[in-house]
């Protein structure tokens, strides 16, 4: 497997401390700027491996299945780690949740019609 792209995103739940909502918004932020045409050109979208890393203050509060379901193609692996940020909102209570997200897409390039060039 070779890594073909790594996209980064940030997601925020401004009210309510919903860690899954923040994670899903981070995934959307990461992937909405990409069009991985190589997977479609060679009809390999279902063969890509997608690794997702979500960083939030309370990893146990993220629904891994919902995160995996947010990716439209590939075999999805989700890792949730401690990170991100919880902060006080305008009302002075800690209710803002920020998730940092990395989405990496991989493809097995052996016996493939295109070749990656080492530089």
Q: What is each of the regions a protein language model found here?
A:
Residues 49-92:
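Mid-chain, well-packed structural core segment of small domains
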Residues 18-26, 62, 66, 98:
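Conserved active-site and cofactor/substrate-binding residues in soluble primary-metabolism enzymes
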Residues 10-14, 58, 109:
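A generic structural motif
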Residues 1-33:
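Long, hydrophobic N-terminal alpha-helical segment
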Residues 34-47:
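Flexible, glycine/charged-enriched surface loops at secondary-structure junctions
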Residues 76-119:
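C-terminal edge-of-domain segments
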Residues 46-50, 99:
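A generic structural signal for short beta-strands and their flanking turns/coil linkers
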């Amino acid at each position: 497997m070779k890594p073909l792209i790594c996209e980064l995103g940030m997601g925020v739940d401004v009210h309510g401390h919903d860690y899954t909502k923040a994670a899903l918004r981070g995934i959307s932020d990461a992937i909405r700027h990409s069009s991985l045409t190589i997977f479609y050109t060679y009809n390999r979208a279902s063969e890509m491996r997608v690794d997702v890393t979500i960083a939030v203050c309370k990893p146990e509060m993220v629904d891994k299945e919902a995160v995996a379901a947010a990716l439209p193609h590939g075999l999805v692996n989700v890792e949730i780690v401690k990170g991100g940020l919880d902060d006080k909102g305008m009302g002075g209570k800690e209710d803002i949740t920020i998730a940092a997200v990395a989405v990496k897409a991989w493809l097995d390039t052996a016996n493939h019609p295109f070749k990656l060039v080492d530089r």
